[in-house]
Amino acid sequence: MIGKEVTLQDIVLELNELQPEVQPVDLFCEEELPNEQQEREEEPQIERASYKVVAPCGCCKVKLRIFISATEFAIRSFQQLLIDELQLLCPDCRGNCKHGGS
């Protein structure tokens, strides 16, 4: 390289001189992709169970029942939400509350 600025003519890459063993790779190799049935068999089945949840209405405290199907992690998370931050509302009280938090 001559001068302060690099020009394209100054940069010459000769891969054959640096690594003569470099060869192009055939992208259509002998590898086979698994079919859809094999993929389904390998996926673990998510175990869900049915639950009846009884919780008080957030306004009038009447008992509310809902039925859900959830994983063990989901039901524990839902339980924590009901204890800490989430309140269910009965049909009578839902009209008294503003929707969307506003």
From Swiss-Prot:
InterPro entries: Papilloma_E7. Residues 1-43 are annotated as: E7 terminal domain. The keyword tRNA processing does not apply. Transmembrane segments: none annotated. The E7 terminal domain is an intrinsically disordered domain, whose flexibility and conformational transitions confer target adaptability to the oncoprotein. It allows adaptation to a variety of protein targets and exposes the PEST degradation sequence that regulates its turnover in the cell. Plays a role in viral genome replication by driving entry of quiescent cells into the cell cycle. Stimulation of progression from G1 to S phase allows the virus to efficiently use the cellular DNA replicating machinery to achieve viral genome replication. E7 protein has both transforming and trans-activating activities. Induces the disassembly of the E2F1 transcription factor from RB1, with subsequent transcriptional activation of E2F1-regulated S-phase genes. Interferes with host histone deacetylation mediated by HDAC1 and HDAC2, leading to transcription activation. The gene is E7. Highly phosphorylated. GO terms for biological process: DNA-templated transcription; symbiont-mediated perturbation of host cell cycle G1/S transition checkpoint; symbiont-mediated suppression of host innate immune response; symbiont-mediated suppression of host type I interferon-mediated signaling pathway. GO terms for cellular component: host cell cytoplasm; host cell nucleus. It is found in: Host cytoplasm; Host nucleus. The keyword ATP-binding does not apply. This is Protein E7. Homodimer. Homooligomer. Interacts with host RB1; this interaction induces dissociation of RB1-E2F1 complex thereby disrupting RB1 activity. Interacts with host EP300; this interaction represses EP300 transcriptional activity. Interacts with protein E2; this interaction inhibits E7 oncogenic activity. Interacts with host TMEM173/STING; this interaction impairs the ability of TMEM173/STING to sense cytosolic DNA and promote the production of type I interferon (IFN-alpha and IFN-beta). A motif (LXCXE motif) lies at residues 27-31. A zinc finger (unnamed) spans 57-93. One of its GO terms (molecular function) is zinc ion binding. It comes from Human papillomavirus 20. Keywords: Activator, DNA-binding, Early protein, G1/S host cell cycle checkpoint dysregulation by virus, Host cytoplasm, Host nucleus, Host-virus interaction, Inhibition of host innate immune response by virus, Inhibition of host interferon signaling pathway by virus, Interferon antiviral system evasion, Metal-binding, Modulation of host cell cycle by virus, Oncogene, Transcription, Transcription regulation, Viral immunoevasion, Zinc, Zinc-finger. A motif (Nuclear export signal) lies at residues 75-83. Its main location: host cell. HAMAP family: PPV_E7.
